[in-house]
């Protein structure tokens, strides 16, 4: 569901801190957490040959060739809520799939893998990625840092869910 009706668009919320003001938006996010939420929209082009087995070996080729980021755009909170409402109300079951990415994921990778998951599941519902900065390194100390960041990010995830719920005053809300 895209702003213009295409099938590969998703919304995102992240509590990653900007590392840079230069370059594409998806490349500016680092691995530091902050309480300020950033909202946005992204769209991808997925190669028709892409299959489920390719996620197992998510090489750089897979990341960059099979799933291409077409557009990554930041939205103000109010615009994000309006877009989420439009997506949800336009879906057959007035639903939203929330994908939480973090551990050992850089932001561009989380965008691509979320799009891939949406594509493979083919559930005909809009998708929201909540991404926290879990790429803290692969050693034990990195795992421990990632765990602390994940625990602290729970408050931002809760705020995100409340924002979606309050922005969509539908009669039915199911959490599983």
Which residues are covered by each model-predicted region?
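Flexible, membrane-associating and regulatory peripheral segments of lipid-active enzymes
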Residues: 1-128, 136-140, 164-167
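Conserved structured core elements
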Residues: 107-111, 151, 155-158, 175
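Alpha/beta-hydrolase active-site loop
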Residues: 144-168
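Alpha/beta-hydrolase fold nucleophile elbow
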Residues: 168-176
């Amino acid at each position: 569901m895209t702003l213009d009706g295409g099938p590969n668009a998703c919304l995102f919320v992240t509590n990653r801190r900007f590392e840079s003001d230069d370059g594409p938006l998806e490349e500016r996010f680092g691995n530091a957490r902050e309480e300020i939420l950033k909202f946005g929209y992204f769209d991808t082009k997925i190669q028709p040959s892409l299959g489920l087995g390719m996620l197992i070996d998510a090489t750089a080729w897979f990341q960059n060739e099979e799933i291409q980021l077409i557009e990554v755009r930041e939205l103000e909170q109010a615009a994000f809520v309006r877009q989420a409402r439009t997506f949800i109300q336009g879906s057959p079951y007035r639903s939203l799939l929330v994908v939480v990415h973090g551990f050992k994921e850089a932001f561009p990778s989380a965008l691509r893998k979320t799009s891939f998951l949406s594509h493979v599941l083919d559930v005909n519902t809009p998708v929201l990625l909540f991404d926290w900065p879990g790429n803290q390194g692969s050693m034990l100390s990195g795992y421990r840092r990632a765990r602390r960041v994940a625990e602290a990010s729970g408050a931002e995830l809760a705020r995100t869910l409340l924002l979606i719920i309050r922005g969509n005053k539908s009669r039915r809300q199911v959490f599983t």
